[in-house]
């Protein structure tokens, strides 16, 4: 006889199902389960007296007969593709199937075969997301990687060689020698990486050399001279070799204004960093580029969201990052020209409209590497409080807004950098770089992080305790973060030219190298849930921002979610 239980009892046992709602941490964001791919009465769950036992939910199938390596049961998936419940099967480090797990000998409709060789991760009452992708990294110190990983980031792309002054200010790994040494170093960490070469040159030879050495992107930075000639040259090389170009434009307008930079792009695809301008770029109107189809605009996280403290912290931050001197009036004027409350306020709104497509950190160079995910959801919450329900919502929930914001640090940077075939979403065939979250800690502290299907860190209690839960519980590295597992769980993203040249073998790299592809034949319309192209105008004296004629302004937040109550110890 079928049994009937209350929704509350069902959610406690198997997690929320279709129509149930979940609050994300202490925000005002409410998601609703859109569909449930498991089968009522045939759910699989691990534990004493539960379903995944021999002859019940566990079959006799060998791995060769199709059993998965790992099953994540009854997880609530939050992804740009939707918000739904499913079992997820992992095999060979990738997502093998999404649907209903179990034993096909005793159950119908089984998509994921559980066998004696299958490990189980309990996803009941948990949220599963794709690992985050931070596409604006200054590789200043290796300790960044641990902080990023523990926040839910599983892929980092950027440039640098350590605390050299070029790297402190610019996101570039210049030259084949440094690219090689950095790739060799990055073999050691449980994280996917890619390196950006220096793109500032008026002739192509050195740029080609860096891409052939493995650089998967090129970075144009004003501190190296982002002139129209350098922009044109770099984009020409990128078009020929299929890598992305990231740009930090000319704050001082020395070599031209924003219109000259746009003209130099000639309609070619480019990833515009910190497009609001506080992180650098044509003052005061770099934000105009948001309205162009060929520009993929991103934000760095210190201005996100706009709060009562944002302006005050930025001047000192900028002076340090760009090697400026408070005793030199011109340096002070340079710094002050970049910090504008009007454009910072408008940035929040443009994100909520889907006109800004990506959020990244700018790690240790006017950005916080461990706060990409936190600040994304703080911004989403602030915008819901200030702007209300999005017009695109179809139910009594915030599902569309949540899908828009999660795309900003998952699928959209992956598309921009030619690696969306491998990462950026929970889809069959993609790498199993995944984050499992307790909803009460969503966006703040992941419960478990997998790289290539292997657990690399998790919330863990006292190792000497009799059970795993006694305090102090905090994020600790797991077995996947040690030994040979590291090199087999994570990958290095390189150029197609570098891959063809066999740089993995020539540099003695242990990690698999994967080539970036389709970086050039994309545009703003490729940015999932974030493809709006309003005509943006910035008043040259008041700095007021208008989008399609509408004034964009909002109040600074005085209090944020995902903040102090989560970091008392």
Curated annotation (Swiss-Prot):
GO terms for biological process: urea catabolic process. It is an enzyme of class 3 (hydrolase). Binds 2 nickel ions per subunit. Keywords: Cytoplasm, Hydrolase, Metal-binding, Nickel. Its EC number is 3.5.1.5. Ni(2+) 1 binds at residues 136, 138, 219, 362. Its main location: cytoplasm. Ni(2+) 2 binds at residues 219, 248, 274. The keyword Hydrolase applies. Disulfide bonds: none annotated. Pathway: Nitrogen metabolism; urea degradation; CO(2) and NH(3) from urea (urease route): step 1/1. InterPro entries: Amidohydro-rel (IPR006680), Metal-dep_hydrolase_composite (IPR011059), Metal_Hydrolase (IPR032466), Urease_alpha_N_dom (IPR011612), Urease_alpha_subunit (IPR050112), Urease_AS (IPR017950), Urease_asu (IPR005848), Urease_asu_c (IPR017951). One of its GO terms (molecular function) is nickel cation binding. It is found in: Cytoplasm. It holds the Pfam family Amidohydro_1. Substrate binds at residue 221. The modification N6-carboxylysine is found at residue 219. Heterotrimer of UreA (gamma), UreB (beta) and UreC (alpha) subunits. Three heterotrimers associate to form the active enzyme. This is Urease subunit alpha. The lineage of its organism: Bacteria, Pseudomonadati, Pseudomonadota, Alphaproteobacteria, Rhodobacterales. The gene is ureC.
């Amino acid at each position: 006889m079928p049994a009937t239980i209350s929704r509350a009892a069902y959610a406690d046992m198997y997690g929320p199902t279709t129509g149930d709602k979940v609050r994300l941490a202490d925000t005002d964001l409410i998601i609703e389960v859109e569909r449930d791919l498991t089968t009522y009465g045939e759910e699989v769950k691990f534990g004493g007296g539960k379903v995944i036992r021999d002859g019940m939910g566990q079959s006799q199938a060998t791995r060769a007969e199709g059993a998965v390596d790992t099953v994540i049961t009854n997880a609530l998936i939050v992804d740009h593709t939707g918000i739904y419940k499913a079992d997820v099967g992992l095999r060979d480090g990738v997502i093998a199937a999404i649907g209903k797990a179990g034993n096909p000998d005793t159950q119908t409709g089984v998509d994921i075969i559980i066998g004696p060789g299958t490990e189980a991760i309990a996803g009941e009452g948990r949220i599963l997301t794709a690992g985050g992708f931070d596409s604006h990294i200054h590789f200043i110190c290796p300790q960044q990687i641990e902080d990023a990983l523990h926040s839910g980031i599983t892929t980092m792309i950027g440039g640098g060689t350590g605390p050299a002054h070029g790297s402190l200010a610019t996101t570039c790994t210049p030259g084949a020698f440094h690219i090689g040494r950095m790739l060799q170093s990055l073999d050691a960490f449980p994280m996917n990486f890619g390196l950006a070469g220096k793109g500032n040159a008026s002739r192509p030879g050195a740029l080609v050399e860096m891409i052939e050495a493995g650089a998967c992107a090129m970075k144009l930075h004003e501190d190296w001279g982002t002139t129209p000639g350098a922009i044109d040259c770099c984009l020409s090389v990128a078009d020929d070799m299929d890598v992305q170009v990231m740009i930090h434009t000319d704050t001082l307008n020395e070599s031209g204004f924003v219109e000259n930079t746009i003209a130099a792009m000639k309609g070619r695809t480019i990833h515009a960093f910190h497009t609001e301008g506080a992180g650098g770029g044509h003052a005061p109107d770099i934000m105009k580029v948001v309205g162009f189809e060929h520009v993929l605009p991103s934000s760095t996280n210190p201005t996100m969201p706009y709060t009562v403290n944002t302006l005050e912290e930025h001047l000192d931050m900028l002076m340090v990052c760009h090697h400026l001197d408070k005793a030199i009036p011109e340096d002070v004027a340079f710094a002050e020209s970049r910090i504008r409350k009007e454009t910072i306020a408008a940035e929040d709104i443009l994100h909520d409209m889907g006109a800004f497509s990506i959020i990244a950190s700018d790690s240790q160079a006017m950005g916080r590497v461990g706060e990409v995910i936190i600040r994304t959801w703080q911004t989403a919450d602030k915008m819901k409080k200030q702007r209300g329900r999005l017009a695109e919502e179809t139910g009594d929930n915030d599902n569309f807004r949540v899908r828009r914001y999660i795309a900003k640090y998952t699928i959209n940077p992956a598309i921009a950098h030619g690696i969306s075939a491998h990462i950026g979403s929970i889809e069959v065939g993609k790498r199993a770089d995944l984050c499992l979250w307790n909803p009460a800690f969503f966006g703040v502290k992941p419960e478990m992080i997998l790289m290539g299907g292997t657990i690399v860190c998790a919330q863990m209690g006292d190792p000497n305790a009799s059970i795993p839960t006694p305090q102090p519980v905090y994020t600790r590295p797991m077995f996947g973060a040690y030994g040979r597992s590291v090199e087999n769980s994570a990958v290095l993203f390189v150029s197609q030219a570098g891959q063809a040249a066999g740089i993995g073998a020539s540099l003695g790299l242990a990690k698999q190298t994967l080539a970036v592809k389709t970086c050039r034949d994309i545009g703003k319309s490729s940015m999932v849930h974030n493809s709006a192209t309003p005509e943006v105008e910035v008043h040259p004296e008041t700095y007021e921002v208008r989008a399609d004629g509408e004034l964009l302004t909002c109040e600074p937040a005085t209090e944020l979610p995902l903040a102090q109550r989560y970091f008392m110890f």
